[in-house]
Amino acid sequence: IVNQDGLAGLVSVRCDLTVTNAYRGEDLAGLAGLRRCESLCIGSAGAPNETLKRIELPALREVAGDLQLCGTAVRSVVFAALQRVDGAFAVGSDALVEIVADELESVGGDLRLAGSTGNAAKAPCEQMYFPELQRVGGELSVARFGKLGQLATTFGALVSVGSIAYEELALTASCEFPLIETVGAVALTDCPALRTISLPRLAAAGSFS
C-alpha cells in the first residue's frame, strides 16, 4: 500500500485508526479531510514506521484517546487545526526536524516528545513551539534531542501539568515555565548545557531534581 487516496472522503473514525508497516507511503495525503478519531496510532516502539517522512493532518481537530507516532524517517509532524488530545500524545522519530501544533490547547494524558525511536539521540530538530498549550494532565517529557537548543518559550502558555521531565538534551540551555504554580515533579537529567531554570510562579512541587 503506497497511498490512501481512496480514503479522501473520510471525516471521522469512531474507533481506532492504526497505520501499520503494511503502508509504505511517505505521507498521509489521503487522510487530509479527517477531523476526528478515537485514537491514532502510527508505528510503535517495537515496530516503528519506516517509510513515512511527513505526517500532516490539516483538518484533524480532536483525538478522543491516544495519539501515538513512532517512525524512523519522519521529518515533519504538522497538525495545523488540532485543539485537544484527551489521552496521551507521543511523538518519537529518528529524523524529526519540525513539529507543529499551533492550536493545541489540551492533552489529557502524557505529552512525550522524543528525538529517537531507540536509546540514543538522533533527530536534528533544533526548536519546537506549542503557543496555545495550557494543560497536560500527565507528564510532559522531552527526551533524546541532541540539537534542541531552544526551549525557552516552547511551553510559555502552559498553566497546568502533572510532572515535567527533560532528559538527554545536549544543547538545551533553559527550562522555563512562567505560568506553572504547582507540579508533581520536575526532573532534569543529562542536560549538560542547562544554565537557566525559571518557574517564577511555582509554589509547590512534589520533587525537584
Label for each model-derived stretch:
Residues 1-30, 36-56, 62-78, 83-98, ...:
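Concave beta-strand-loop units of leucine-rich repeat
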